[in-house]
Amino acid sequence: AKPYGINVLHDSEGQLDVFVTDSEYVIDKDPVEVHGRRIRHWKLTVEGDAISHTLVNTFGDITGPGMLYEVESIFADRQHNRLMIADEQENVIKVYTMDGDFTGIILAKGRFAGDPEGIALYKCGENDGVWIFTDQSHDRNRFHLFDRKSLQYLETFTMSQTTNTDGIWLTQKPTGRFSDGVFCTLNNDKNVSVVNVSSFKEAMPHLFRCDG
């Protein structure tokens, strides 16, 4: 087992839902049952300085198109009850429910030139927004955009001087000089590229301006 991706989000009762992927590289030597434990879901409770945790679920299909192989990044969308799971061996994003059921939806099949890596979600209100999926490359990354609600492909953008990206993160909260939030990408395991979300709104207003 090799813990890799993690996503943490608050629930309605003030606890934390934590989803962790198991990216085991020795795929051919795994018994089939191991694929059923590719994702772990914990509940964390924080009380003062104390943290308690409970394992809620372990899951992953063991047969069929929803079977999870080399899983890396993971990201939850509670409003739509979806988990986006990057499967590097199959070069796709597989969509599960937060309860651990495969939805039958596979995104970006045939679209990744490199490896599917970091995932981020740009929200427009409770239901709308844009998914960002990293297409890792040693030359130049590509970032594929999908509609949050319909899961339809929208378009792809690149970032100059940013390569070999694994993790990404996006916040829409104003932070200092980043008035609309910030988009961060790991750059070739050396540093972090930082982009003002305002740049997205200027370059792709039809996607990132929530007011239309």
Protein language model annotation of sequence segments:
Residues A1-G212:
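Sequence/structural signature of beta-propeller domains
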